[in-house]
Amino acid sequence: GRDGYVVKNGTNCKYSCEIGSEYEYCGPLCKRKNAKTGYCYAFACWCIDVPDDVKLYGDDGTYCSS
């Protein structure tokens, strides 16, 4: 697996979060995407040990089409 920002399906946008709320929000979010865990980094959810088939920010460029 790899580490990185997970993105919303179809938009390539990061999941924004607030520092301090990371474990209530980012941890479960990352686990739903089959990552080991995650936390809030630079106002977005950063996931640890993400499976290779899960798209991360940067895989399709950094354009966010919300």
UniProtKB/Swiss-Prot annotation:
Annotated Gene Ontology cellular component terms: extracellular region
Glycosylated sites: 9
Chief localization: secreted
MF terms in GO: sodium channel inhibitor activity; toxin activity
Disulphide bridges, residue numbers: 13-64, 17-40, 26-45, 30-47
Tissue-specificity statement: Expressed by the venom gland.
Localisation per UniProt entry: Secreted
Source superkingdom: Eukaryota
Residue ranges occupied by any LCN-type CS-alpha/beta domain in the UniProt entry: 2-65
Keywords: Disulfide bond, Glycoprotein, Secreted, Toxin
Protein's GO biological process: defense response
CDD domains according to UniProt: neurotoxins_LC_scorpion
Keyword Coiled coil assigned: no
Pfam families in UniProt: Toxin_3
PTM remark: N-glycans are core-fucosylated, heterogeneous and short which could be the result of extensive trimming.
Family designation: Belongs to the long (4 C-C) scorpion toxin superfamily. Sodium channel inhibitor family. Beta subfamily.
Function as written in the Swiss-Prot or TrEMBL entry: Beta toxins bind voltage-independently at site-4 of sodium channels and shift the voltage of activation toward more negative potentials thereby affecting sodium channel activation and promoting spontaneous and repetitive firing. This toxin is active only on insects. This toxin has very low anti-insect activity.
Record comment regarding domains: Has the structural arrangement of an alpha-helix connected to antiparallel beta-sheets by disulfide bonds (CS-alpha/beta).
Protein name: Toxin Aah6
Protein source organism: Androctonus australis
